[in-house]
Amino acid sequence: MLMLFVFGVLLHEVSLSGQNEAPPNTHSIPGEPLYNYASIRLPEEHIPFFLHNNRHIATVCRKDSLCPYKKHLEKLKYCWGYEKSCKPEFRFGYPVCSYVDMGWTDTLESAEDIFWKQADFGYARERLEEMHVLCQPKETSDSSLVCSRYLQYCRATNLYLDLRNIKRNHDRFMEDFFQSGEIGGHCKLDIRTLMSEGQRKSPLQSWFAELQSYTQLNFRPIEDAKCDIVIEKPTYFMKLDAGVNMYHHFCDFINLYITQHVNNSFSTDVYIVMWDTSSYGYGDLFSDTWNAFTDYDVIHLKTYDSKRVCFKEAVFSLLPRMRYGLFYNTPLISGCQNTGLFRAFAQHVLHRLNITQEGPKDGKIRVTILARSTEYRKILNQNELVNALKTVSTFEVQIVDYKYRELGFLDQLRITHNTDIFIGMHGAGLTHLLFLPDWAAVFELYNCEDERCYLDLARLRGVHYITWRRQNKVFPQDKGHHPTLGEHPKFTNYSFDVEEFMYLVLQAADHVLQHPKWPFKKKHDEL
């Protein structure tokens, strides 16, 4: 039976246990639904895609007069894109390419396909196609280990961790944390294949360092009572990037979301364990976001120190800085934008955090300027720029400073999601562009010679991006003073030509008004 389970993982026919795999209650109390539909907690637009991959729930819904999703049963051909049976015309979305990057390919069609595989649900499909069994179970109570290439993602059953003798220091990602016999399972290990997957061994790129000591045990950890603690709930292991930087931390969250797709499970009845081999804590300015993925507090690995811990189902999540991963330093083909994956991620997070769209307002464009209270990259003539914006009657202007001590992250998201033009200097705060409405524009006031970072993120999300172009109309305070590198454009402050600024903002406004998803189609002649 477990053999079928493992092969099911390879074929993407089995989901991680949790809400998606809960057996429908076909003997429910009269007047009660046959399934706990409220546990699905997905945006309405995502429901047909969920039902496509969970046909058992679709079948129950069809029979259940109380199912709220009956209208979606006629759309079961809709699919995310990574499913083997998914036809391109039914995918959640498809990128748009405006020109061909001849360094990559020679047709628009192939450019779209490349971008889809680099940064859209095609990326999830490639991870699924890489899956192979590294530790083969023979019986139902055995363990298993299934991984993608380079051990960037793994899934284990009946996993044994022995933390009785571990030693912690200042290193968050020790490579020799476990010795032979301290991590493993009762299954037939293909040690040769396991050891061949270490080419990308690196803390935030692979799980090879953690799993290279995986051992074929001569006992069944749970059945033979070798565990001090047995974790029944599905558990995600994650190695986290910087929790104080939104750009880096959201590489964690997007990869957790992709991992959920690979598992075909969006249940929040799961544990998340932060894999950290140090004794330190973890500063997290965006901890509210975890509520989109789990009902429980994030667990530090050190919680289990001095114990033998067994996990019935464990997932080693995709990592934040993988080579050719998403979205840190990802090489992307030029000329393409708008991935369904990043749009779905934004919708998923906003839905689960109860962030709603309160507008837009007819006759108004909501403009938000992100101010900086840091030492560098301040807008020196900010008041002058704001006063110029206020001369346009259709602009509703607000200035915000996303300081976590004064404005919680959920409140920040509410402001961002209810913004039509988002303006800010180069910096991690621009990662908020992920949560702008589809019709919005982001104006990176000055990119400080880091041209690709937020341009590429805007392309991934599918929102319009503009930045300052005329160097003779931006005025740095000085040449910048990096602590070790000397002169550096990110380490100074700037003022801007007001006329050029207004020209660019009006361009952004024109894009907003012309966007197909802008609810008000009439002309705004006042602009």
From Swiss-Prot:
Sugar attachment sites: 354
EC number: 2.4.1.255
Alphabetical keyword list: Endoplasmic reticulum, Glycoprotein, Glycosyltransferase, Signal, Transferase
Ranges spanned by the short sequence motif Prevents secretion from ER, renumbered to the chain: 524-527
Taxonomy, superkingdom: Eukaryota
Example GO BP: protein O-linked glycosylation
Name of the protein: EGF domain-specific O-linked N-acetylglucosamine transferase
Gene coding for it: EOGT
